[in-house]
């Protein structure tokens, strides 16, 4: 039933360009000549505007035949009251736009008096940030160079230590070889001494037995 009612209302609106003669509720208006016609008289957020939106004038009664024609003739047929109403709404819209622009400008200025001072402050902040970043980069470069120098010094120290260990090991090996050669000579001398003593003991024994 409700769907048929909306369908019939849409058909009537198409025939007579959607003029509505009913009472105007404050919650129906959206600031222009387009108003929301709500069947139950209570506009809510869940109401579909496309199903209950009609174009009507705030004036006396009109016939459907008077609404037919071009938009130019419709605009020319406005009464003085309607023109004042339209102008008043346009002034209100312009005031709201200007108020929004002033708020956005005051928000952009961030407490400054003019854009010049705001831009100078921003340029100073950008310059300070650039100088700080340049200083940080310089410090990083110096630390990197110091690290490279320390690494090179440590590498050279390690090389020197390794070479020193090689030289020391070589000297120890040479000393060990010398000691081993000396021990071998002493061993041969000791063997000769023992053999000579054995020969003498054998000869003395033979001489003793003969006597």
From Swiss-Prot:
InterPro entries for the chain: Fibin (IPR026772)
Cellular component aspect of the GO annotation: endoplasmic reticulum; extracellular region; Golgi apparatus
Pfam families (UniProt xref): Fibin
A GO molecular function held by the record: protein homodimerization activity
UniProt-annotated location(s): Secreted; Golgi apparatus; Endoplasmic reticulum
The keyword Glycoprotein is annotated on this UniProt entry: yes
Protein name as annotated: Fin bud initiation factor homolog
Gene label: FIBIN
């Amino acid at each position: 039933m409700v769907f048929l009612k909306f369908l019939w209302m849409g058909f009537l609106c198409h025939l007579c360009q959607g003029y509505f003669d009913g009472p105007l509720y404050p919650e129906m208006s959206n600031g222009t000549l387009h108003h929301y016609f709500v069947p139950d008289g209570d506009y809510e957020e869940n109401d579909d505007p496309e199903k209950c939106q009609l174009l009507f004038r705030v004036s006396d009664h009109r016939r459907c035949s008077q609404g037919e024609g071009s938009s130019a003739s419709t605009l020319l047929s406005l009464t003085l009251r309607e023109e004042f109403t339209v102008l008043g709404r346009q002034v209100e819209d312009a005031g709201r736009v200007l108020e929004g622009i002033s708020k956005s400008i005051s928000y952009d200025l961030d407490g400054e008096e003019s854009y010049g001072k705001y831009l100078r402050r921003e340029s100073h902040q950008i310059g300070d940030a650039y100088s700080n970043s340049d200083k940080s980069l310089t410090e990083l470069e110096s630390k990197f160079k110091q690290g490279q120098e320390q690494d090179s010094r440590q590498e050279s120290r390690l090389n020197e230590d390794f070479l020193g260990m090689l030289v020391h090991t070589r000297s120890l090996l040479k000393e060990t070889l010398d000691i081993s050669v000396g021990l071998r000579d002493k061993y041969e001398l000791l063997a000769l001494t023992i053999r000579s003593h054995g020969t003498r003991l054998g000869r003395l024994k033979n001489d003793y037995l003969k006597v």
